[in-house]
Amino acid sequence: MELDTLDVALLRLLTEHPRIGVLELSRLAGVARATVTARMERLRASGVVTGYGPQVDLAAAGYPVQAFVTLEIAQGRLDEVTEHLAALPGVLEAYATTGPGDVLCRVAARSNDDLQQILLELDRFAGIRRSTSVVVLSTVVAHRTLPRLTHGPQRGAHHAPSYRDPA
């Protein structure tokens, strides 16, 4: 789906004010409530907006140790490795990649000892041939999407004549 300027404006407002209601969102965006409702439904239906939930600080929740783990997978075993990774609570996310490894995982642990147990559990799985890990010291750029959306190609909004562009 190609996003237009109104879509991006709504996503920016939702990111800046995650608990905002539709009425306030429409006021800040300068469009009718029905327009906001329709746009939000379209963004959800197309998979652009995948959910609304809290952003959890893992360190504050008791998981201050994070690492990125690169896995080399045995030929033809990606599906079963994927199932194994999904079953491990310490694995936050995993991506199939190019390069020297096949899968890149982000894991969270309570301590270095806990991290070591997670790594041992990964290495014990038959479909994983080798793993290498790097421990996160600090986050220098947190997960974000708005810079990509606001600096990417966008077309003008298709909107009702009452819409006033804030520019």
Predicted features and spans:
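A compositional/biophysical signature of low hydrophobicity enriched in polar/charged and small residues
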Residues: 1-167
